Amino acid sequence: MSVFVDIHVLQTLPPSNPNRDDTGAPKSATFGGVQRMRISSQAIKRATRQDFEGKIADGNYGVRTKKIVELVARTITEKRPDLEAESIKLAEMGLKAIGFKLAEPRGNKSDKELKESGFLVFLSAKQIEHVADALISVAHEDDPAAAFKELKPRSLVDTDHSIDIALFGRMVAEPNALNVDAACQVAHAIGVGAVEHEYDYYTAVDDEKKRNDEADEGAGMIGTIEFASATVYRYATINVDLLRENLGDDAVTDRAVELFVDSFVRSMPTGKVTTFANRTLPDAVLVQVRNDQPINMSGAFEEPIVAGQHGFAKPAIKRFVEFEARLRELTGLEAVESLVSWTTPRGESFSELGKQVRLASLGETAAEAVRGTR
């Protein structure tokens, strides 16, 4: 029996541009025959991962970089300052033995630049330490490379996955044996109704020009910023069994569930945030622990909400509550546990869907519900 944690969020965004396309416009998608505001899953995952970065104990957070030679060499030097002169050579040897292809940085002719991997590599702090420790142990062997190969070097980076690697996965082109399947899936956030993009025309004043009576009074700079507003439906799911497999420990798995739920619910990509300050909390949240399958409920909004005097959020909440109840009635699929939270009076109808939990305790309570399934 597989266990899943589904997270459903309805959140109002004021005029903003949290996730823009290559033209600078807020991302969008056609759904239900109309254009909707969209926030990409990649941007949401990045914001979620950044949010729980400071909440994870040392070693349980990963780093994604091409500069793996620099990372390993620095760790060797920190542990054994006497090996500083050899650290780069050792790091390159070890990483090549693991299977990473290293090359000179593109477009940089500096002799000080160390070799890089050809792609971003996602490693946990513990894995970097394991590689450094193994290299230190063979540093004074007659043939360090041969001695290192005897340590089964790939195993050094295929155990002790950090929480973020276990959740979001790791794709390695070479060696692909180091791939880690992601335990979470994140949907693109989608507006519940049609969106209209607008433009903010702005001018920047040249302070020195303003002080000069003889200078022209024109602006120092003019431009436009495209923005939109919407109530969006956000969804993510965690495969708890796969998360446990990736992490190898029940307690760490529970902590990962807690962190992900809290950070997914309360984080948001920060595009143009200094211009729009669009840091809102969700209007309403439903977290369900299931033992059947994940269920994305975006179908509740395939027919776009048409805003009236009550805006988008209130009718969207009503629509979602009715959709979820009807879905249970028609399918017979019931969650093991349903937890709800809301931050505005219009979200109170979510009380029909499950047990009310304060937003600050949602992740902790979800982790407790997961423990109850064992």
Predicted segments, located by residue:
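Basic polyanion-binding and macromolecular-assembly surfaces
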Residues: M1-R38, Q42-R374
